Amino acid sequence: MVGDIATRWKELSGSSKWKDLLDPLDLDLRRYILHYGDMAEVGYLAFNSDRRSKYVGDSCYTKEELFARTGYLKANPFRYEVTKYIYGTSSIRLPECFIIKSLSREAWNKESNWLGYIAVATDEGKKLLGRRGIVVAWRGTIQLYEWANDFDFPLESAVMVFPGANPNDEPRVANGWLSLYTSTDPRSRFDKTSAQEQVQEELKRLLELYKNEDVTITLTGHSLGAVMSILSAADFLHNEWPKITPSLQHSLCVTVFAFGSPQIGDRSFKRLVESLEHLHILRVTNVPDLIPRYPVFRFTDIGEELQINTLKSEYLKRSLNLGHFHNLEAYLHGVAGTQHNQGEFKLEINRDIALVNKGLDALEDKYLVPGHWWVLENKGMVQSDDGTWKLNGDRSKKKQEEEDEKEENNCKFP
């Protein structure tokens, strides 16, 4: 799994725009992409999407147990510490798949959703990675095709995120993306600051902490998470890079691995992003997946592209279900087995095919893997001392709330 990542991390992070590494796909780069894809997948596995739960829209797990409870630790040798959870809200109406709301009158929060996490490599992880890796992993959306068919995101000025941009070439971004990234809710303890501010402040804190080391910032996400990864990376390079010391600028590398990303903005936005010479973006797209083509009009692609085609996989059923082509685990299966553009499918990485069926029923039946096998234990039902069962939210979530409240109180001045 590790390969030569520790010695090739600059090249694998896009220092040469992945020249000669994509076709055919370099083995270490294949491992590298899968590593960050797995970190994006953690966001899906931890997210509470059950509207009957009063904790819907939040992470089921605390920062300390996030990787262990989602299966990341046993499957990956790289070790990280989660330092920050990201929360977001929206000032405009968004589809249910973006901001999920609870049916419970005792909901933890009516307007906020957990959007992902920030993690930093431990000393053990640093040895395998070759440097101190900071990761921003944005959670994707649930059932994204619902909005693709009937929701329109008009373009609007993004100068609030990119002040000082050329007024004659003003970048424009879909208003839904901007709203989720920049909105605040003073009534919420989670969204008093926007997702934008939460991410940028934590990145600045971590860079100060590790300013004397080789550091990378890698942003990753699938679907909506891919959009947020690109937007937040461009934000950081545009606004914070000039404030970084020259020595840190020399060693710092900022990379995005975006899986199945919808389009984000117009050609002016593309020109702004491409002017950020220290930003490296690799978009992974699946040939039969339609989502990377949405929204359709006046939008354009950004970054380098690695194209896969899961239709070539002999492990997968022939299906007309468009969701099968957009699923993140299907993408990672495709990365593990893609050959050069005209080649067939062959697993070059020993990646468990059972992972495909975590949220799908896409594997051929002969592999004897049940469909949709990843579920929260007992679907979140907890047995009381008297033997009765009820959906009372994850106990670890209550623990997290207590820790957050304690931390908030400790930060108050007397």
UniProtKB/Swiss-Prot annotation:
Subcellular location: Cytoplasm
Broadest EC class assigned to this enzyme: hydrolase
Keyword entries, A-Z: Coiled coil, Cytoplasm, Hydrolase, Isopeptide bond, Lipid degradation, Lipid metabolism, Ubl conjugation
Identification of the protein by name: Phospholipase A1-IIbeta
A GO term from the CC aspect: cytoplasm
Organism: Arabidopsis thaliana (Mouse-ear cress)
Coiled coil spans: 191-217, 390-410
Composition skew (Basic and acidic residues), residue ranges: 392-401
Primary location class: cytoplasm
Homology family: Belongs to the AB hydrolase superfamily. Lipase family.
Entry's Gene Ontology molecular function annotations: phospholipase A1 activity
Role: Acylhydrolase that catalyzes the hydrolysis of phospholipids at the sn-1 position.
Cross-referenced Gene3D superfamilies: alpha/beta hydrolase
EC number: 3.1.1.-
Pfam families xref list: Lipase_3
